[in-house]
Amino acid sequence: MPPRNTYEKGNPKRQNSPYYKPSFLRREETTNDEEKFQGHGLKTELHSALKSSNLNLIRRTYQTGENPYLSDPHDRGSSSRFNRRYERGLKFYQKGEISKRIAQERTLQKQQEEEELKRKLKQEEDEKDKRKLIESGDLPNLELHEDKFLLDLSKFKIYYDNNHGYEWWDTAYLDEKGELMEKYDMNGTSPAEEKLAEDIDEVDDDDDDEHPSIRYVAHPLPEKINEAKVSIKAYLTQHERKRLRRNRRKMAREAREIKIKLGLLPKPEPKVKLSNMMSVFENDQNITDPTAWEKVVKDQVDLRKRKHLEENERRHEDAIKRRKEAVNMNVEKPTVYHCKVFQFKNLQNPKIRFKLKMNSKELSLKGLCLRIRDDGPGIIIVVGNEKSCKFYENLVMKRIKWNEDFELHTNTGDIKMDMHNNSISKTWEGYLQDCKFKGWFMKVCNDQDSLLRTLGQFDSEHFYSPVQT
């Protein structure tokens, strides 16, 4: 039995040895020349590329065409790139051929640019024409999707032919042939009108002939448009108002003087005073009784003064009345009233009383302020809208300094009052369905019973609490 071949197991160290050869390359000692190598396959000498295991060496050394198993005599790629270049031959450009080709390319490019410019200009003109047609209503506006409401021309032609070329609202006055019915003939009148014309003696037939369709049309009344311009009120300064009043009075005085000169108005009596009574009557008549004349002048002066005072009083009353009416018109009666109740220990300081009174008047509050004697405790009730009551609460609770000392002015002299123990507190806040207060007033009561009776007149005695004071 021959010894075991340890190299056939594929030991890599042994295979890389220079003394190692594959089994198919080992020569056999035989006398047969035909069998030079031992192995399976064709009895052909192996290619030299198969004798090396270095692939990089094979790739550099051998070409594809040299491999008889891979080479193709009809394959042009088997030759090298240099051989292919020589097979094509050398081609030389003629003189001016390159410049001519470049000029042709430039000319072609210029023509393409001109055509593109013409196309853009034509497209812009088409867009303008299309926009005009859309504005005139000849084409639908695609942005508003008007194309969805286009009329089908085929259906419209059938409709147009069936109605003899008239609209649907005119078909009621046409016969089957598409002609106007006899009773609606514009050249004549209807049978009902002819019968009515026989009963009436005077009938104006010309109007019916000229306007025969008026009797079938309901004409609406033309709307009257007020073309009067709305005048914007101008707000003037005090100096401008004075100048305007002065000029207006001057123009009225000049107009009155012109009427007196023309005799349209009687001449006014002279304004006689004690200082000018002699000069007034020197030109008219002699004074026989100066004492009586002096009495007449004094009576005229008193009369003018009395009229002047009465006129001022009347204007003052009218102004007050207008202001009250304006306030009543602007102020709406609320559904509920906001009410706040405060109780204090002392209200001798006249500055505090003035602030309470003036703020209640300016804020249009209703209610009262009662106190027991000048140096006693009291109560404040205010009723109004929520904003005014909130402002008044801020005044009473934060802005007014109740514990601030002050000097009380009396007939005997000034007395310094110590108010460090004085204070005020809010006892109640809420809403009232009805308000019995007509306005806001202040009152000094002699005792607590008198204060409660005053509150009872307005159903407010439950607001007062002696414990708080």
Swiss-Prot record:
GO biological process: mRNA splicing, via spliceosome; spliceosomal complex assembly; spliceosomal snRNP assembly
InterPro entries membership: Pre-mRNA_splic_Prp3_dom, Prp3, Prp3_C
Database matches in Pfam families: PRP3 (PF08572), Prp3_C (PF06544)
UniProt entry tagged with the keyword Nucleus: yes
UniProt subcellular location: Nucleus
Annotated spans, Disordered: 1-45
A GO cellular component annotation in the UniProt record: spliceosomal complex
Keywords linked to the UniProt accession: mRNA processing, mRNA splicing, Nucleus, Spliceosome
Disulfide bonds: none
Keyword Nucleus in record: yes
Biased composition (Basic and acidic residues): 1-11, 25-45
Protein's job: Participates in pre-mRNA splicing. Part of the U4/U5/U6 tri-snRNP complex, one of the building blocks of the spliceosome.
Further facts: Present with 432 molecules/cell in log phase SD medium.
Subunit structure: Component of the U4/U6-U5 tri-snRNP complex composed of the U4, U6 and U5 snRNAs and at least PRP3, PRP4, PRP6, PRP8, PRP18, PRP31, PRP38, SNU13, SNU23, SNU66, SNU114, SPP381, SMB1, SMD1, SMD2, SMD3, SMX2, SMX3, LSM2, LSM3, LSM4, LSM5, LSM6, LSM7, LSM8, BRR2 and DIB1.
Protein name: U4/U6 small nuclear ribonucleoprotein PRP3
